[in-house]
From Swiss-Prot:
Catalyzes the S-adenosylmethionine monomethyl esterification of trans-aconitate. Belongs to the methyltransferase superfamily. Tam family. This is Trans-aconitate 2-methyltransferase. Its EC number is 2.1.1.144. GO terms for biological process: methylation. The lineage of its organism: Bacteria, Bacillati, Actinomycetota, Actinomycetes, Mycobacteriales. It catalyses: trans-aconitate + S-adenosyl-L-methionine = (E)-3-(methoxycarbonyl)pent-2-enedioate + S-adenosyl-L-homocysteine. PANTHER family: TRANS-ACONITATE 2-METHYLTRANSFERASE, TRANS-ACONITATE 2-METHYLTRANSFERASE-RELATED. GO terms for cellular component: cytoplasm. It holds the Pfam family Methyltransf_23. It comes from Mycobacterium sp. (strain KMS).
Length: 254
């Protein structure tokens, strides 16, 4: 279950890659703009402000996120991106920090690119930090007793969860697009107590939370804190620097 409040606790940090992605989309007057994986809708609203004449359509597979987006006035639909297809008037498709949850997303990108009209825009951003110390710490703890029997069948994502920018560029170039692909490592400056734990609670730890009782969850988090504090030490001035790699692709159909 997605928790919109937990996700929004780092809204400024999580939002920056969205704006960096959107800045490379050159559509002037799109008819329909689609946000795949809209979350609580706080960034979908930005699309509506940029293109006020467009129909802005949003999708998410979390009922909680869809409800939060609708409270912001977003035309949010409940559904899986795997089953989504563009309408004839779709000119911009944007997916921010969603497709990493979909193993077959390279095939989806190819299919969407082929279904969009010439001159349309397809843009996405995905985290590229699955081998980061934060994820490694979660996996190490989950392999220990008493957690291993409870969490053994969670498919913790390791290895090549997302492609490299060059791989995405090749994929969409072969699909007939002109492609702008890059990666950025953001150094987030965090100041709260145990900030990395709070950050991953809203994202990477969701599968763990769903398997544990409230008491177990509190204990798991307590045991995770020293591992994360060792990997991301708090500076003398109270700040913690949290590197976060992200991969971007903006394609225009031919």
């Amino acid at each position: 279950m997605w928790n919109p409040e937990a996700y929004l606790s780092f809204a400024d940090h999580r939002g920056r890659p969205f704006f960096d992605l959107l800045a490379r989309v050159g559509a002037d007057a799109p008819r329909r703009v689609v946000d795949l994986g809209c979350g609580p809708g706080n960034l979908t609203v930005v699309l509506r402000h940029r293109w006020p004449e467009a129909v802005v359509e949003a999708w998410d597979n979390s009922p909680e996120m869809v409800a939060a987006a609708r409270e912001r006035g977003v035309q949010a639909n409940l559904g899986d991106v795997r089953g989504w297809s563009p309408q004839p008037d779709t000119d911009v498709v944007l997916s921010n920090a969603t497709l990493q949850w979909v193993p077959e997303h390279p095939e989806l990108l190819t299919r969407w690119a082929g279904a969009l009209a010439a001159g349309s825009w397809l843009a996405m951003q995905v985290p590229g930090n699955f081998d980061a110390p934060s994820h490694q710490a979660v996996r190490r703890l989950a392999d220990r007793e008493p957690w291993a029997p409870l969490l053994h069948d969670i498919p913790f994502r390791v290895g090549k969860v997302v492609e490299t920018p060059a791989d995405y560029a090749a994929l969409l170039t072969d699909a007939g697009c002109s492609v702008d692909a890059w990666e950025t490592t953001y150094i987030h400056e965090l100041t709260d107590a145990h900030p990395v734990l709070e950050w991953i609670t809203g994202t990477a730890l969701r599968p763990v939370r769903s398997r544990l009782t409230d008491e177990q969850w509190d204990r798991f988090r307590a045991e995770l804190i020293p591992l994360l504090d060792e990997a991301y030490p708090v500076r003398a001035d109270g700040r913690t620097f949290f590197p976060f790699r992200r991969v971007f692709v903006v394609a225009r159909t031919g």
